[in-house]
Regions:
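Membrane-proximal extracytoplasmic
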Residues: 1-341, 383, 457, 643-645, ...
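Signature of alpha-helical transmembrane segments and their immediate interfacial
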Residues: 1-31, 430, 498-549, 606, ...
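Interfacial segments of transmembrane alpha-helices in multi-pass membrane proteins
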Residues: 2-8, 12, 287-291, 327-384, ...
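Small-residue-enriched core segments of transmembrane alpha-helices in multipass membrane transport
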Residues: 108, 346, 358-379, 447, ...
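Helix-loop junctions and hydrophobic alpha-helical segments within the transmembrane domains
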Residues: 319, 326, 330, 406, ...
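C-terminal transmembrane helical bundles of large multi-pass transporters
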Residues: 322, 388, 631-1006
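Transmembrane alpha-helices and their membrane-interface boundaries in multi-pass membrane transporters
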Residues: 395-409, 431-450, 457-499, 604, ...
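Juxtamembrane segments of multi-pass membrane proteins
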Residues: 512, 531-628, 632-639, 672
Length: 1011
């Protein structure tokens, strides 16, 4: 008795197996986490070091360089980049994908500690921040008021709202953006200071010495201990105003005599706006292991409580919610899943014409899908866009096995057998082929799971979810489906007219195909030559296909990045930001906007209406906005979208030019590359971050005069730094919170560089001299920022490409351009999405090779032959040819979705060959000739092949015509499978038989020899 007979003869056992699959699957569905993508750890460590008043060159040489050299020795870093601007050094260590961020952070901290003593004494301690997971926050809340100033809003958010959001389960950090923290500002009046003989460094020293936080301990007697507090620090504005800054005999100078003491802000260099209103944002970042959708819902649940407690006149609400796109995408995929189920059910009915026959695959489909959730839970996966996409494709796969069983039972019943007998024979015949097809499909996805890189990290769950569905489907097809056929099917005396009509149609197709195949096989050599030509066509089509990492998804938001004149202030940039907002807000697709503006730059996002409520998609809106924003004089604006896949940020194209040469020489090369890029027509926007156009005034100190006055360079530098630097002295406490104390010359006395020469400096003799006595001003032009990439001098050319050039061709154009214009000593590197693309390119061919190799070995073991697998796999290039034609015609691009689709296609098309070759071998073993065996096998298997192909092709039709959130990726994969399987099946029905005649094993002769 064959093992499949057990489940047919013992229906309760079969039902119990299926019930266990159902129960475990349903239990798993409720416990699986829901995310946008499979969990990956994209960690970025940012090291920020402030050195108030220092120019970029000083920052780069004395802070950035020693820190970079030490940090680079830490393990797990993919690449280091840094930016040195006035007053701040920022080093970004981008870690390797899925590298342990805690281990890397520990090493980086150790390396920083090793060089801290090399940093200037006036520099602040380096601050480390770690960003894990999404490059942008999951949600943003905006708070604004017509009555309260920014610093009052910020203080309330720090005291009340931020702690509440931080305490929400799953929130990693609630970061305030655009806030201005309270600070005690002592605005120095240089004229009053000169008249009273007070220098800025005197004020600095007095604040440091007389606002001192002391911890004196406690008294302790035999029975009583008392804590002691010394009132050495200051707490109120009035106390600061009466701070003694100079005492000359009986003459005392108080701080309020030389300065205006107010409660202001730490800095005034950032403006944040929501839909044109000045605001303060809170960015809500989700912990890496948390369920994104659950955390977002918990945040939404606490928002009403936050709103109720807001001070009168303050408004707060969620201004951006990334889970809206995720939820819409998941809803679209779930809807596609339902559509595919309905379509496949109709296809089965149209092919079989019997409601009873339809019941078997209709039950097998959802049962197999539900059972897949249990295996997903065992593997530690989540419900995400890629696993759901796998389930959509799985519908066509899981129904195949049930269709084959039903069709085979139906065929045997038409030959006069009873339902039970037909089911037993059909299950015995198909046990081997179904097992072979199941193993082959599972084997196809193994290389994807071990590919590595971003593709491997993201698509491992996709691949193994699909493999799990196939495994469950094979189990159901060999246990439940034959048993149901034996119980549901009946021995009808006469089939219905509908069934008879369908049978007549397939009889005609069967005879027509059989006759055509026999005629063509008389010249099978021609078919083989045609197959070889198609194989060559695959190589050509693949090489010429437009390639990119992933298609751009319409996420309902278009981002904006603007750069202004090199010496522009935040106020000047705000005028540009207002113009940008005015243009965008007039568009019909506009819903709301946010902007973050700082000196020389502005960043923002235009949130669009729901996908169903607008005529333009995000890409078209982006292109139109780019043209309109280009009309704004004095500012360069780039419109772009979020990367389609996680792990990268910034503009889509980021090419880095590295060298050890000077920045002046590097600028010449980068400008030459930039000019060619702009003239090429390949970019909507392109620019370089190296701009040597920032005016800088150098205070040239006359060292001889300084020495003659008995002064040192340190005294001169300290006096000027205290007046202009804007650095904080120490802290003061108000209502349980500490705030910085910052003395600085008031703005009216630092409007232009010439005013610096009128500042007074105290000499050792006590005399006050103007700075012009010992200094003069020389003007020069310097870079806005000094940038390093992998510790080398660098210029990054960033841009947004037109849709007429692929990502691969564009990066190759940039590489060739640099090669043409740059002398030796200049290298090209990549950052952001471009680096992702370069890292992933080339991996697909290796994956495909290993997939074919594994499938070949599995089939060889199954068929105990090295010839039969070649016959079966000849169908693979035929299907690839069909898919690549439509990729080259521009229906989609060669990207991670289409590449995974091509691998999937290989498994799907191989099933046809398995069905034909397996049956042909059996017929040969039964005594048929090789030619008769392959013709009959192909003819008999024609109907199940057409049925499974139609089920799969029409099952992915909802992917092909997908719209709405996340449609681009689904369309790419759907187009590949739809076209490749359709065309591949057509070729397979003729090429596989010809190949079988050419190299297939002669089982009839083998049997004769054995006898």
């Amino acid at each position: 008795m064959n093992w499949t007979d057990i489940f047919i003869r013992r229906p309760v056992l079969s039902l119990v197996v299926s019930a266990l699959v159902l129960v475990f699957g349903l239990k798993a569905i409720g416990s699986l986490p829901v995310n946008q993508y499979p969990q990956t750890q994209n960690a970025i460590v940012t090291i920020t070091t402030a050195y108030y008043g220092a120019d970029p060159e000083t920052i780069a040489g004395f802070i950035t360089q020693p820190l970079e050299a030490s940090i680079a020795q830490a393990q797990g870093i993919d690449y280091l980049s840094s930016t040195s601007v006035s007053g701040v050094s920022t080093i970004v260590a981008t870690l390797k994908l899925n590298y342990d961020s805690n281990a890397a952070l520990t090493q980086i901290q150790t390396q920083i500690s090793a060089v801290k003593n090399q940093l200037p004494p006036q520099a602040q301690q380096p601050i480390l921040t770690v960003q894990i997971g999404q490059s942008t926050a999951a949600m943003y809340m905006g708070f604004y008021s017509d009555e309260l100033p920014n610093n009052a809003i910020t203080d309330y958010l720090l005291r009340v709202v931020k702690p509440k959001l931080d305490s929400v389960e799953g929130v990693q950090n609630a970061e305030i953006i655009g806030g201005r923290k309270f600070a005690l500002r002592a605005w120095l009046d240089r004229e009053k200071m000169a008249g009273l003989g007070v220098g800025a460094d005197d004020v600095f020293s007095a604040m440091s010495a007389n606002n001192y936080l002391s911890a004196v301990g406690s008294t302790k007697g035999d029975m009583v201990a008392v804590d002691l507090v010394a009132g050495t620090d200051l707490h109120t504005l009035e106390e600061f105003r009466k701070l003694v800054v100079k005492k000359d005999g009986v003459n005392i100078v108080y701080l309020d005599q030389v300065a205006s003491v107010t409660l202001g802000s730490e800095d005034y260099n950032t403006n944040v706006a929501f839909s044109g209103k000045k605001s303060v944002f809170i960015a809500i970042k989700v912990a890496p292991q948390a369920n994104l959708l659950d955390v977002a819902q918990r945040v939404r649940d606490v928002v009403p409580d936050i709103q109720k407690q807001l001070p009168i006149g303050m408004t707060g609400k969620i201004v951006y919610d990334s889970t809206k796109f995720i939820t819409s995408s998941i809803d679209e995929v779930v809807f596609t899943l339902v559509e595919a189920l309905v379509i496949v059910t109709l296809v089965i009915y149209l092919f079989l014409g019997s409601a009873r026959a339809v019941v078997v695959p209709v039950i097998a489909m959802p049962l197999s899908l539900i059972g897949t959730f249990f295996l997903m839970q065992v593997l530690g996966y989540s419900i995400n866009l890629l696993t759901l996409l796998a389930l959509v494709l799985a519908i066509g796969l899981v129904v195949d096995d049930a269709i084959i069983v039903v069709e085979n039972v139906d065929r045997h019943m038409k030959e006069g057998k009873s339902p039970l007998e037909a089911s037993l024979i059909a299950a015995r015949e198909l046990g081997g082929p179904i097992l072979a097809m199941t193993v082959v499909l599972i084997a196809v996805y193994i290389p994807i799971g071990f590919q590595g890189g971003l593709t491997g990290a993201l698509f491992t769950e996709f691949a193994f979810t699909l493999a799990s569905a196939v495994a469950v489907s094979g189990l159901i097809a060999l246990t439940l489906s034959p048993m149901m056929c034996s119980r549901i099917f009946t021995e009808e005396q006469e089939a219905s007219s509908f069934v008879q009509k369908i049978d007549r149609i397939f009889d005609k197709v069967h005879h027509s195909y059989s006759n055509t195949l026999r005629d063509l096989l008389s010249t099978w050599q021609v078919i083989i030559v045609m197959g070889v030509i198609l194989l060559g066509g695959v190589a050509y089509l693949y090489a010429t296909a437009r390639s990119e990492l992933a298609p751009t998804e319409d996420q309902g938001i278009v981002l904006m990045q603007a750069s202004g004149p090199p010496n522009s202030t935040v106020n000047q940039m705000q005028t540009y930001a207002d113009q940008i907002y005015a243009i965008a807000s007039a568009e019909p697709e506009y819903e709301q906007a946010f902007q973050i503006t700082s000196p020389t730059s502005s960043f923002g996002g235009i949130l669009l209406k729901d996908w169903s409520s607008r005529s333009r998609n995000a890409t078209k809106f982006q292109e139109d906005m780019q043209q309109k924003w280009n009309t704004i004089a004095g500012v360069r604006v780039a419109a772009f979208q979020f990367p389609a896949l996680p792990g990268a940020q910034g503009l889509p194209v980021q090419v880095v030019i590295n060298t050890t040469e000077s920045y002046e020489q590097l600028n010449e090369v980068s400008q030459a590359v930039l000019d060619k890029a702009r003239r090429s027509g390949n970019f909507f926007f392109v620019d370089s971050d190296l701009k040597i156009d920032k005016p800088q005034d150098v205070l040239v100190i006359d060292r001889e005069k300084v020495a003659a006055l008995g002064m040192t360079q340190q005294q001169v530098g300290s006096a000027l730094s205290a007046a202009l630097g804007g650095g904080y002295v120490n802290y003061f406490s108000v209502a349980g919170r500490s705030y910085r104390v910052i003395p600085q010359v008031k703005q009216v006395d630092r409007l232009n560089p010439d005013q610096i020469l009128d500042y007074y400096i105290r000499t050792p003799s006590g005399a006050m001299i103007q700075a012009r006595t010992i200094a003069s001003i020389k003007q020069k032009v310097v870079p806005q920022s000094i940038n390093h990439f992998q510790q080398l001098n660098s210029a990054t050319i960033s841009g947004v490409s037109t849709p007429f050039i692929s990502q691969a061709d564009l990066l190759e154009f940039m590489r060739q351009t640099l090669k043409e214009v740059a002398p030796n000593g200049y290298n090209i590197d990549y950052a952001g999405p471009s680096r992702q693309f370069m890292a992933e390119s080339g991996g697909f061919l290796v994956t495909m090779f290993f997939a074919i190799l594994i499938v070949f070995l599995v089939l060889a073991a199954q068929f105990e032959s090295f010839r039969d697998p070649i016959v079966i796999l000849v169908s693979v290039p035929l299907a690839l040819f069909g898919a690549l034609i439509f990729i080259n015609l521009g229906f989609t691009t060669l990207n991670v979705y289409t590449q995974v689709g091509l691998v999937t296609l290989m498994g799907l098309i191989s099933k046809h060959g398995i069905l034909i070759v397996e049956f042909a071998n059996e017929l040969q073993a039964a005594g048929r000739s090789k030619l008769d065996a392959i013709i009959e096998a192909s003819s008999v298997r024609l109907r199940p092949i057409l049925m499974t192909t139609a089920a799969m092709v029409l099952g992915v039709l909802p992917l092909v015509i997908a719209s709405g959130a996340g449609a681009a990726g689904r369309q790419s994969m759907g187009i590949v499978i739809f076209t490749g399987l359709s065309i591949g099946t057509l070729f397979t029905l003729f090429v596989v038989p010809a190949m079988y005649l050419f190299i297939g094993a002669d089982h009839h002769a083998k049997k004769f020899r054995q006898q």
